[in-house]
Every structure is written in C-alpha cells, then in structure tokens.
Design a protein with these regions (language model features):
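Broad hydrophobic/π-residue packing in well-ordered secondary structure
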Residues: 18, 28, 38, 58, ...
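Core dinuclear metal-dependent hydrolase active-site scaffold
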Residues: 1-24, 90, 94-171, 236-239
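Generic detector of bulky aromatic hydrophobic side chains
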Residues: 29, 146-148, 224
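Stable alpha-helical elements in mature extracytoplasmic
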Residues: 11-15, 38-41, 77-85, 150, ...
Length: 239
C-alpha cells in the first residue's frame, strides 16, 4: 500500500479505515509537503499508530530551519504542521528525504522526482515566498505501460523552470492538477499533456470562486475525463 499525503487531521479516522482494510500496513507514505491539508492525517496517525505500521516515509527534503526563518504565507496551515512533522520524524530511521531528479522503485512502480525542496525552489519562488508549495513533490509514477503524474501543490512560480527543464517528460496517462487546480500549471500545460484523465483534489463548491472553475470547464469542454471530490470515490488501474 502506497499513500500520498492523506489529508487534514480530521481525515485521520477515515484514512485509518482504509489502512485497516489493507492489513494496517503501509509500504510507503509520501508527504509532498507539510501543509496541514496534506500532512495533517499523517501527523495524527504517526503520533498514535494504533497498530498501523509504515515501512518507509518519503518527504520533499524540506529545510526546516530555513522555512521557520523565512516564514509561511499560510500561517497555521504551514508552520504548525511543519513543526509537528519535524518533531515526529526527525529521529526516524525509515524516513527518506527525496531530491530533484531522483529515481526509485517502490512496490514495483518506477518513480521519477521532478520537483522537491532545494535551491532551485528558493531561486524561483515568487513574491509570496510560498516555499512550501513551490517545493512540493512533483513526481511521475510509472507501471508497465501507464503513468500517473502527481504534481502536489507546485504553483506557477515553478512553471518556467519545470517545463523548460523537463518538457514533454511532464505528462502522464493520468494527471493530478497542481495546487488543487489553482494558481499552478496553466491550461496550455494540461492541453499539452493530453492525459486520459485529470484529478482535482477539491470540491465543486470552489468552482465559482477560484481559477479551478475555468480550468474544470475547459477540460470538460475538451472531452477530458475529470475527477474531483464530487465524483469520489475515484479509481483507475495503472496498467
């Protein structure tokens, strides 16, 4: 069983049920970045496992001291869960800090890391100094024939570097929209990817007030398969 992020702290009970259905064992748990909507449930479960075992934890190689000093535009969404995650895992012997361009194999799947927290993020961050989102994991997960591009919460600050550096590698048969479909990769980027389906980790109620509304309509108009929390539970088989 592989988990990527896991949601808010209040999502922990539901996530525990899913883990229990898989023998209370997690082979690999990826934390894209330490904002509360991504790491909250992990923090709760790791602090009180209740029988849950985790073989490996992979994070984005965040710089704890740097982020604490630089600050966080999302206040309690960023610094408090960062502090909790750091204190929980700093002495763990099963945590791996991923780096840009790293390649690994997990549960028979090939994973290529295109974005992680490093000096390149620091050089490209925008005026909001949103280091945690911009330093979020972006990685392609590939099985025998198909791939899934997970983009985390990477925002538009990183678009120029990522697409100039990796170009057509940044695609997949299935694609998760970056930063919940808001202020991340552009419409033209998703068109170029031409994925079979797009996943948005957001509820439809945000479509009228956030940029995701326009992106959602565009993808639907283009005839793309589109999933969000409103269509959950969502699943695909990665061949």
């Amino acid at each position: 069983m592989i988990i990527i992020d896991g949601g808010w702290a209040e999502n922990a009970p539901a996530l525990r049920k899913v883990i229990a259905q898989n023998g209370n064992h997690v082979d690999a748990w990826f934390i894209s970045h330490t904002h509360s909507d991504h790491v909250g449930a992990f923090n709760v479960i790791y602090a009180d496992p209740q029988g849950v075992t985790i073989d490996r934890i992979y994070d984005n190689g965040y710089d704890y001291e740097f982020i604490k000093e630089a600050g966080e535009p999302y206040d309690s969404m960023g610094l408090e869960p960062l502090e909790t995650f750091h204190n929980l895992t700093k002495d763990a012997d099963n945590i791996i800090h991923l780096r840009r361009d790293e390649e690994l194999e997990v549960c028979g799947l090939r994973i290529h890391v295109y974005n992680a927290f490093d000096d390149i993020v620091k050089q490209n961050v925008g005026p909001d100094l949103d280091y945690q989102n911009d330093g979020s994991l972006c990685m392609k997960i590939t099985n025998q024939e198909e791939s899934f591009l997970y983009t985390g919460d990477v925002k538009a600050d990183m678009n120029k570097y990522l697409f100039e550096t990796y170009g057509d590698e940044l695609t997949g048969d299935y694609v998760q929209l970056s930063h919940h479909g808001n202020w991340g990769f552009g419409t033209e980027d998703y068109d170029r990817m031409n994925a079979k389906a797009y996943f948005a980790d957001i509820t439809p109620e945000f479509y009228e007030s956030h940029p995701i509304g326009e992106l959602h309509q565009h993808l639907v108009d283009e005839g793309k398969q589109y999933y969000d929390y409103g269509t959950a539970p969502n699943s695909v088989e990665l061949k």
